[in-house]
Swiss-Prot record:
SMART domains: AAA. This is Vitamin B12 import ATP-binding protein BtuD. Its main location: membrane. PANTHER family: METAL TRANSPORT SYSTEM ATP-BINDING PROTEIN TM_0124-RELATED, VITAMIN B12 IMPORT ATP-BINDING PROTEIN BTUD.
Length: 249
């Protein structure tokens, strides 16, 4: 798989790094670790929203060399939960994120996949937290999906599963898997270790802004690594063919 993004000695004050790594096309990479590990700081840096020490190459060019307009064409970024910036119909908010605004069938498909069919006419300031999260997810998917944006390369998601129920999480997993199969690189933070063990291709385990381990999910999410990150003991079990992590006292 080709390298989409290369990080070299990336650091920000005392919150992050220095750390290095690469993001590959067609893979799902999870950032895991305790609160304050630096996951959100790292995602914002990878999105080009902040600057600091070290270097990031995106599609072979320095990240800081990308204009905001060009960057929005090649990568999409979901930050942590935000309140709606202003009131507008959901369909209008989603349309603003589409590069090809004639693709109404794609908008309807993505909205349907996230159970937003009956919310398209509702104002964004009348949504519950979970509904707004799904609208924001639909927006970044519409922005970056290769179906309508052949230039799309990278999707960055900060705790995308927040406020989603089990069925909605499953629906999002299907969407992300489909995007991955179309060649998109996906990087997301997660607090659900078992979800990472099932759905990620690779993982970066962070603590205190440092990278404790990186590599294949099963090689990173080991009881010794997790004990070092979280300060508690873990066991990894195989239950009916599924691997599962549990904490132990």
């Amino acid at each position: 798989m080709s390298i989409v993004m290369q990080l070299q000695d990336v650091a920000e004050s005392t919150r992050l790094g220095p750390l290095s790594g690469e993001v590959r096309a067609g893979e799902i990479l999870h950032l895991v670790g305790p609160n304050g590990a630096g996951k959100s700081t790292l995602l914002a840096r990878m999105a080009g929203m902040t600057s600091g020490k070290g270097s990031i190459q995106f599609a072979g060019q320095p990240l800081e060399a990308w204009s905001a307009t060009k960057l929005a064409l090649h990568r999409a970024y979901l930050s942590q939960q935000q309140t709606p910036p202003f009131a507008m119909p959901v369909w209008h908010y989603l349309t603003l994120h589409q590069h090809d605004k004639t693709r109404t069938e794609l908008l309807n498909d993505v909205a349907g996949a996230l159970a937003l069919d009956d919310k398209l006419g509702r104002s964004t300031n009348q949504l519950s937290g979970g509904e707004w999260q799904r609208v924001r997810l639909a927006a970044v998917v519409l922005q970056i999906t290769p179906q309508a944006n052949p230039a799309g390369q990278l999707l960055l998601l900060d705790e995308p599963m927040n406020s989603l129920d089990v069925a909605q999480q499953s629906a999002l997993d299907k969407i992300l898997s489909a995007l991955c199969q179309q060649g998109l690189a996906i990087v997301m933070s997660s607090h659900d270790l078992n979800h990472t063990l099932r759905h990620a291709h690779r993982a970066w385990l962070l603590k205190g802004g440092k990278m404790l381990a990186s590599g294949r999910r099963e090689d990173v999410l080991t009881p010794p690594n997790l004990a070092q990150a979280y300060g508690m003991n873990f066991r990894r079990l195989d239950i009916e063919g599924h691997r599962m992590l549990i904490s132990t006292i």
